[in-house]
Amino acid sequence: MALLEYKCPACAGKLEFNANAGKVKCPFCDSEFDMAMFEQLDAALDSQVEENLSWQTASTDTWTDSDNAGMAVYSCQSCGAQIVTDETTAASKCPYCDNPIVMMGNLKGDLKPDLIIPFKLDKKAAKAEYTKHLSGKKLLPSVFSNQNHIDEIKGVYVPYWIFDSKAEASMQYDCTTVNSFTVGEWRVTETQHYKAFRSGSLEFENIPVDASKKIDDSLTESLEPFDLSQAVPFQTAYMAGYMADRYDVTAEDDAERVNARVKTSTERTFADSVAGYSSVAVTDSNINLKNGTAKYALLPVWIMNTTWKGNNYIFAMNGQTGKFVGDLPCDESLKKKITWGTAAIAAIATFAVGFLIHLFT
């Protein structure tokens, strides 16, 4: 994860990327700057290019000595997360598990992102959506709704591999049609069997697969979809005021996951074309994936973690669309209190009714 500082040329204040305006803004003097002014700086930092992956990827740029100037890499000894901050930051906490982090090295040689989707929703929107997520949860432990805790929600650019692939497939199916009719006194069921064949190709573009071991795959998949048409070429200025997770899953490691998603989608698409039968069963499947390429991208996610009774609960919101995900626990002790309280009220009501009946009879 990276937390970078840019100084305002007007007042020397710390600049931040404003999600609503889509510009870099100074919160002290309200000066606004278009992203174009940072292009020349990034072009100079990107002057050294190096091939880094043997697998077919669109990503070739790496962090260089000039990129690393004034930056340090920290590691979380608890969950293994690696983050990048400016060297003036003496200490920080992990956004995934809230544990302390320690200095470990720099980014030189690491692959640099190709694309980034800037945050569209700010911290205020994330807090509002989290509060809405808690609404009506009467058995929720109080730590989850503590206002000071809600203020700890963090904007994190999560690393993703964006895959493009072509699937060439041929499928064979056993199909049946079933008809019932009456002949005299007999009810006849006629089942006819058919063979169906399908072949063709499908193009897949912009399949996102997260490149971080610290966040659960099911959580990141639940945050989808991201509108990748809004992705722009990576510039470090977009990270001002936010963090960016350092990827620890390579494109090769993620290939198995994306291949499974492509194959599942291909099988479903082909099966949808076999219509008009009572039953359809696949008997042979041959799917070949070709021309697979991957781009390295950073996608915006608001993250908050809460530890309760030894378990870590992570809540996340898509920083582009506002989609919110995360499981909430039930406070069993509070549940028992409510149950006993309800039972006590019922007992008192029953006693009162009985007493009144006895009194007036």
Where are these regions (language model features)?
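Residues immediately within or flanking Cys/His clusters that coordinate Zn2+
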Residues: 3-5, 21-23, 69-73, 91
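Short cysteine-rich clusters marking metal-coordination/redox-active sites
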Residues: 8-11, 26-29, 76-79, 94-97
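Short functional micro-motifs and their immediate structural scaffolds
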Residues: 13-16, 34, 84, 102
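Short cysteine/histidine-rich zinc-coordinating motifs and their immediately flanking basic loops
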Residues: 21-25, 38-44, 88-93, 106-112
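Short Cys/His-rich micro-motifs in 6-15 aa windows
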Residues: 30-37, 98-105
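Charged, low-complexity helical/coil segments in non-catalytic cytosolic or luminal regions
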Residues: 109-307, 311, 359-360
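Extended hydrophobic
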Residues: 163, 295-345
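Juxtamembrane boundary at the C-terminal end of a transmembrane helix
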Residues: 351-361
